[in-house]
């Protein structure tokens, strides 16, 4: 369905996640609105409701390279993340349930850093995630308000993107598992470090950790979440 207004254009998409699909109970009715504003923002609004108790944490896995083809990787991009904590992983790449400080770790992007040196100079730390970031940050928005989660800047094009969300988690992924087998615009292959993802979400594996914000959804509730990519 098309969305049209004075300063907004977009599209509304609906999907019914049927009872038992992938093992999850309940019919989960999901609506996602994608809106482009006159302020150069892409606004993504999620809503969902269910007819039986289930789990729900929706996100977006868009890849961003702000160079517009000038660079095949994001290693020269500069990134800042507005979080002081993260959820560490075990050797099997699963959350441990801990919430640790990013201070004195390679995940500390509280001040802008160039991604290339930040990743390549910390190979041992990022070995578990195939040589790059694939980590979840814990954002300071316990009251559900929109906060600035991250910023990305490309020095070649001068483009800047800010990420805002009302969700408690931000998964940052630097395309460590891309291997060139997928091609994009103009037939160019997507190789390792081709782009970066900012996946706003609930904390990973929250169903197994009671101290994480709940991802349970009940029939009398409406799930809602908002993410903004501002340019």
Residue ranges with predicted function:
Residues 1-231:
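An exposed, glycine/acidic-rich loop-and-rim segment of catalytic or binding clefts
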């Amino acid at each position: 369905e098309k969305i049209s207004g004075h300063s907004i254009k977009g599209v509304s998409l609906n999907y019914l996640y049927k009872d038992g699909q992938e093992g999850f109970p309940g019919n989960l009715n999901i609506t996602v609105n994608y809106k482009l504003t006159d302020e150069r923002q892409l606004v993504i609004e999620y809503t969902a409701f269910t007819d039986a108790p289930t789990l729900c944490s929706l996100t977006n896995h868009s890849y961003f390279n702000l160079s517009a083809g000038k660079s095949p990787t994001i290693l020269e991009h500069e990134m800042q993340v507005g979080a002081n904590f993260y959820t560490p992983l075990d050797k099997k790449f699963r959350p441990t349930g801990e919430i640790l400080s990013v201070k004195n770790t390679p995940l500390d992007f509280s001040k802008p850093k160039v991604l290339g040196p930040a990743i390549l100079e910390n190979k041992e730390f990022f070995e578990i995630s195939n040589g790059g970031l694939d980590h979840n940050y814990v954002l300071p928005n316990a009251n559900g308000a929109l906060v600035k989660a991250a910023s990305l800047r490309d020095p070649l094009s001068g483009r800047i993107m800010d990420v805002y969300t009302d969700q408690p988690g931000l998964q940052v992924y630097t395309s460590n598992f891309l291997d060139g087998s997928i091609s994009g615009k103009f037939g160019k292959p997507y190789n390792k470090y081709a782009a970066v993802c900012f996946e706003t979400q609930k904390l990973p594996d929250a169903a197994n950790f009671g101290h994480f914000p709940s991802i349970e959804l009940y029939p009398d509730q409406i799930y809602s979440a908002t993410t903004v990519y501002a340019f």
